[in-house]
Amino acid sequence: MSKFQHDVMLKIVKIIDLVMITIPFALCWELYYSYQVYAKFGWKGNWAMIGLFAVLFFLLGKVYDSFWMSLQRISELIYGQVLAAMATDGILYIVICLMARRLCNLLPGIAAIAGQVVMATLWARCAHSWYFRIFPPQPTAVVYDVRHGLEKLINEYGLSKKYDVKMTLNVEECLNDLSLLDGMQSVFISGVHSHERNIILKYCVGQGINVFVIPRVGDVIMSGAQPMHMFHLPVLRVGRYMASPEFLFVKRAMDIVISLVALVILSPVFLITAIAVKSDGGPAFYKQVRLTEDGKQFEILKFRSMRVDAEKDGVARLSTGDKDDRITKVGHIIRACRLDELPQLLNILKGDLSIVGPRPERPEIAAQYCEEMPEFALRLQAKAGLTGYAQVYGKYNTTPYDKLQMDLMYIAHPSLIEDLKIMLATVKILFMPESTEGVAEGATTAMEQETK
């Protein structure tokens, strides 16, 4: 099957999904909400509302991976579908209330959501099964330099579930006989130095083989290079993170507006959580020194989720998750719902944090990381954030090196659109238990987790 046929088939299946999810909203609008608005809509207006739903669902679906049929778990695909549909329904409910100049009955909307859940489940199960039947895993080779971490890449990270790994080759073995890659549709290159990697890249591109490079830190930094011409030569300019003044101004304005609105809306939750934590014994809030842009220190504010004497021995430790006996009963609940992070909205308002940016580390833990990999300090080029690229696309126990690369990918490409995508995608991970996992029991830092 050609790439063109492959792409056409995928688009058709996605369009079917778009129609299936839109139908419940269309019925809800046509049978009820269209009669509630102040100005009556004609058939063109009705189609405009239905079209608006479809466009918003498509855009949010891209953020929540709602159309990613090759996801390992059907439940994750359904979750993304339902989340995108509910977010779209919520936005259009607000629009309808504004047009009706009053609060409208929620029951028809809830009925539409129920219909969308059924449609999403049906489509996800059929599409997931169809995808792996029509597009079986591609024969794949993995080329590596150091074997450390290779098994994690193939098994834990799910490479073997999406690709048919036929062989794993040491880079020297591969360079001695590049024809070993013949017959492969995909090649993953991990930890290979640029000179050897370029030889393999050229061969694979010439043979029409897809190449996926797992980058090193230097590669991530180079990805943000500015192409230019000097001395009649193509040149790539690489420098320190230097976002434009306009970008920083708009980003700060967004931080202030969003944090203020969130504080007002979530104030009842804020109050209830504070009372619950206080009733557990000890103060409601917990302050801790963290690092932000250029290594500046600030006190991050959280709802206390651990015992007051959690670090009485003076040793800084990362949480080991549900098995951590330092976490209180209330702490388990607020951590699961991410409510312990709510007070950081005050840090954002003050200017210590941004909504999106690399998560701030404790100075002593950051120092341990920097001893092992000095490039870890590069993430201090940008202001720390409440959520970030690594939080959305990694896990709590993703290795420090992988988190660093994710943070540097964000820093290399500053974009307000990317910030908005990360904010929206953060909603998805709030209810995903694997994103709250801690480090292995007995490890004090994630660096130790990597070696366990």
Could you tell me what each predicted segment is?
Residues 1-132, 452:
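Signature of alpha-helical transmembrane segments in polytopic membrane proteins
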Residues 1-24, 125-267, 437-438, 442-452:
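N-terminal hydrophobic signal-anchor/signal peptide
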Residues 81-85, 89, 253-261, 337:
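Loop-to-transmembrane-helix entry motif
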Residues 81-85, 137-152, 283-306:
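Membrane-cytosol interface motif
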Residues 218-219, 286-326, 386-405:
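Short, glycine-rich, amphipathic interfacial segments at transmembrane boundaries or analogous
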Residues 247-310, 347, 416, 422-452:
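A hydrophobic, helix-centered structural microdomain
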Residues 320-383, 422-430:
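A short, structured surface patch at a secondary-structure boundary
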Residues 375-452:
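C-terminal terminal-structure detector
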